[in-house]
C-alpha cells in the first residue's frame, strides 16, 4: 500500500479478517485451549522482546549479548544453530516458548533488524525494524512491515543476506538485482502485507491444512 506503514497494515489486516469472518457468520471461533476467540474484540500489540522477557522471567533487550541469550536457550532446552546471532536467537526463543500460547489476536512487533531485511528501521529504537506478525490461535496468520524503500540500504542488507545463503542459512535471501534496480527508479513509502489465506480459512472453518492449502499438488512434500 503506497504511503502506508506497519500501522496502516494493522488496520487493513484486521478489516480483511473481520470482513471474511462476518461473511461466513463466524466472528467468534473456538480456540485450541478450549476457550473462544472473539475476532471483534480488541487485538493486542506486543513487542517480541517483551514477550520473550516474560517467558524467560528476565529482561531481554535489543542490546542483550549472544552468550547471555544462549544461556537462556540452554536453560529452557531450546536448540540453536552455531551460526545464529542475537537476533536469530531471540526469534527462536519466541517461536519455541511463546508463539503457541498466543491464542487471542496479537500483533507481535518490533523485530530485531537482522531478521527482517525488507523492513524499515524502527522510527524510535535503534536495532529494531518496523515489522510484525499476526498470531491467532497460536498460528502466524500474516506478516507485515513498513517497506524499506532506500535502495542503498536495501542492497547492503541483501548482500549481507546473500553471505548467509552462502553459509547454508535456509531462511536467508538471495541478492535480487532486478528488485534493486526497480527500487533505484523510485519507490514511495509503503506498507507490505502477506496474508496466509489457507490459515485464515482454517481459523474460520476449523478445517485442517490439508483441506485449505491452495494448489496442494504443486507444493513440495
Where are these regions (language model features)?
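Short, glycine-/Ser/Thr-/acidic-enriched flexible segments
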Residues: 1-4, 112-115, 123-125, 139-141, ...
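Class II aminoacyl-tRNA synthetase-like tRNA-binding/catalytic domains
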Residues: 1-8, 18, 71-78, 202, ...
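Short, amphipathic alpha-helical segments
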Residues: 3, 7, 11, 42-45
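Hydrophobic (often cysteine-bearing) scaffold residues that line and stabilize catalytic clefts
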Residues: 9-13, 86, 90, 150, ...
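Composition- and surface-driven signal marking solvent-exposed, interaction-prone regions
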Residues: 10-13, 120-121, 213-215
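Metal-assisted phosphate- and nucleotidyl-transfer catalytic regions
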Residues: 16-139, 160-187
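Hydrophobic, well-ordered secondary-structure elements that form the walls
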Residues: 108, 144, 196
Amino acid at each position: 500500500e503506497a504511503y502506508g506503514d506497519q500501522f496502516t497494515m494493522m488496520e487493513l489486516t484486521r478489516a480483511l479478517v473481520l470482513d471474511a469472518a462476518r461473511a461466513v457468520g463466524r466472528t467468534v471461533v473456538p480456540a485450541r485451549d478450549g476457550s473462544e476467540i472473539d475476532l471483534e474484540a480488541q487485538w493486542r500489540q506486543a513487542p517480541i522482546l517483551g514477550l520473550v522477557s516474560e517467558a524467560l522471567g528476565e529482561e531481554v533487550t535489543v542490546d542483550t549479548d549472544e552468550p547471555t541469550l544462549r544461556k537462556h536457550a540452554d536453560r529452557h532446552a531450546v536448540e540453536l544453530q552455531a551460526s545464529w546471532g542475537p537476533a536469530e536467537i531471540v526469534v527462536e526463543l519466541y517461536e519455541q516458548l511463546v508463539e503457541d500460547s498466543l491464542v487471542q489476536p496479537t500483533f507481535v512487533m518490533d523485530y530485531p533488524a537482522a531478521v527482517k531485511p525488507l523492513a524499515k528501521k524502527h522510527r524510535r529504537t535503534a536495532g529494531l525494524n518496523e515489522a510484525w506478525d499476526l498470531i491467532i490461535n497460536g498460528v502466524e496468520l500474516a506478516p507485515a512491515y513498513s517497506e524499506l524503500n532506500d535502495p542503498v540500504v536495501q542492497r547492503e542488507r541483501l548482500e549481507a543476506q546473500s553471505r548467509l545463503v552462502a553459509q547454508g542459512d535456509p531462511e536467508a535471501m538471495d541478492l535480487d538485482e532486478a528488485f534493486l534496480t526497480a527500487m533505484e527508479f523510485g519507490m514511495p513509502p509503503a506498507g507490505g502485507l502477506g496474508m496466509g489465506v489457507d490459515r485464515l480459512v482454517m481459523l474460520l472453518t476449523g478445517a485442517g491444512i490439508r483441506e485449505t492449502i491452495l494448489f496442494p499438488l504443486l507444493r513440495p512434500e
